[in-house]
């Protein structure tokens, strides 16, 4: 769906900017390199007092961004949301099945097959995340642990950046298109080891299809960011959650749609309508109605302009089965995106991503679907990486690993100039001329500590998608 708006970019373009990074997207990629060891519980790096391969992968990526003049802020997932209970259960079952098949293939001496299945069943735990946090502290990188969804926390940092508040971010690195639904204005996907990525500007999406895409030259099938293509019907990747619709007949042409096979058109849409489309087509918080995929959802929202009208139409269609309680579940999913609980590094407490609507401010309203609101002191301990966000118990600090090799830019050895050069003390320095004394590693600091003692500000609504 988003492919027509993706543009290749070299991250050096954003030198001097601050970037939020979805930590778990990096951890998952890094874990693939040691999937066999994780699947068989052979964690040799602990015995050798070395960083785990998934930690080294993340640190190298962070060092690369630092080399290009970008300040990364690594954002971790926190506790599980009740709204994702069903999705989490399905994922656990899929992982367990993959692990079972991995052990079967290993017993059959199929090492490659076992590695593949173990990679599909990798589960990133809070303990693994804490290993990365320890390494980030050691290398002086900023980080923050979200109370719940990292995506919502990243969106909150993007709000701060848009307002010019300290600690905000200008860009986002992720592999999850949920960040577009959350309203992040600038998202980069597919970051590789050479600093090349795919850039997506939300304002471009809302301004309509690019000229070449509208003409059918690029992205005529509206492929998603993960490369999965939409077919002529509804079996396509939605904006959020990867939910798939079944192949069904069309629901009629949308007024804002350039053609049956062309990219979707959001000209004249408000961000609220865009988010309604994302939820309606299926997301982590709510599966799609059978027969309602991304294209049909777009057609319905474009025609009726509000989800209330869309739901009324669906309830009146005898060919569509709307599950019992779907209307309430839809509102909860929409509110979970819009009003997620996030950590405010300025006020050092939790707040909603956007101010609560009147119906959620009523004390009689059950807001358990947003996750429990925790005390400020607990929120700080979680955000600064000292407390497990799920068990709410202090982490055990892992032993410090031995010195390890760092990232170097393409085509350069660690002895050359212009890169990140490892010094005798284990830190990394910018060395444009290849000479000069090595600087000590930066002082470890948690992102959430940056604003301690500063006057708290009230964070407003942040980004305004309704203008124009």
Report the location of each language-model feature.
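Acidic, metal-binding active-site segment of PIN/NYN-like and related structure-specific nucleases
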Residues: 154, 162-191, 223, 243, ...
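Acidic, PIN/NYN-like endoribonuclease modules and their adjacent C-terminal/linker elements
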Residues: 184-216, 228, 259-261
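Non-catalytic nucleic-acid-binding/docking modules located in mid-to-C-terminal regions
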Residues: 6-15, 209-219, 224-468
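Eukaryotic beta-rich interaction modules
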Residues: 1-5, 56
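Amphipathic alpha-helical interface elements that mediate macromolecular binding in regulatory proteins
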Residues: 53-63, 130, 134, 152, ...
């Amino acid at each position: 769906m988003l492919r027509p708006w993706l543009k290749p970019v070299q991250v050096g373009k954003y030198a001097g900017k601050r970037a939020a990074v979805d930590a778990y997207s990096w951890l998952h990629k890094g874990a693939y390199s040691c999937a066999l060891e994780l699947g068989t519980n052979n964690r040799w790096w602990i015995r050798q007092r070395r960083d785990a391969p998934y930690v080294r992968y993340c640190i190298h990526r962070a060092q690369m961004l630092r080399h290009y003049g970008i300040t990364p802020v690594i954002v971790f997932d926190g506790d599980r949301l009740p709204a994702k209970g069903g999705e989490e259960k399905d994922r656990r079952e899929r992982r367990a099945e993959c692990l079972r098949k991995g052990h079967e293939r290993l017993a059959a001496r199929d090492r490659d097959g076992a590695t593949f299945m173990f990679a599909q069943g990798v589960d990133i735990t809070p303990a693994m995340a804490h290993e990365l946090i320890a390494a980030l502290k050691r290398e002086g990188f900023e980080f923050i642990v979200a109370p719940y969804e990292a995506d919502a926390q990243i969106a909150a940092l993007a709000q701060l950046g848009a307002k010019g508040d300290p600690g905000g971010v200008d860009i986002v690195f992720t592999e999850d298109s949920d960040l577009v639904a959350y309203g992040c204005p600038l998202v980069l996907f597919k970051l590789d080891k050479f600093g090349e990525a795919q850039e997506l500007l939300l304002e471009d999406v809302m301004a309509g299809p690019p000229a070449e895409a509208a003409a059918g030259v690029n992205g005529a099938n509206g492929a998603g960011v993960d490369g999965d293509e939409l077919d002529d019907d509804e079996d396509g990747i939605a904006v959020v959650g990867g939910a798939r619709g079944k192949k069904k007949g069309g629901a009629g042409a949308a007024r804002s749609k350039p053609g049956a096979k062309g990219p979707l058109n959001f000209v004249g849409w408000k961000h609220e309508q865009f988010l309604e489309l994302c939820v309606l087509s299926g997301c982590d918080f709510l599966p799609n109605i059978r027969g309602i995929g991304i294209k049909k959802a777009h057609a319905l929202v474009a025609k009726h302009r509000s989800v209330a009208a869309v739901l009324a139409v669906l309830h009146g269609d005898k060919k569509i089965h709307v599950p019992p309680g779907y209307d309430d579940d839809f509102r909860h999913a929409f509110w979970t995106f819009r009003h997620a609980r996030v950590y405010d590094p300025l006020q050092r407490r939790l707040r909603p991503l956007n101010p609560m609507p009147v119906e959620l401010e009523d004390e009689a309203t059950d807001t358990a679907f947003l996750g429990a609101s925790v005390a400020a002191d607990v929120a700080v301990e979680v955000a600064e990486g000292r407390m497990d966000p799920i068990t709410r118990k202090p982490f055990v600090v892992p032993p410090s690993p031995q010195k390890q090799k760092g990232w170097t830019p393409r085509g350069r050895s660690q002895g050359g100039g212009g890169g990140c050069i490892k010094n005798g003390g284990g830190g990394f320095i910018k060395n444009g001329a290849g000479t000069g004394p090595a600087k000590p590693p930066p002082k470890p600091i948690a992102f959430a500590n940056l604003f301690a003692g500063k006057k708290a500000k009230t964070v407003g609504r942040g980004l305004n998608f309704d203008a124009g």
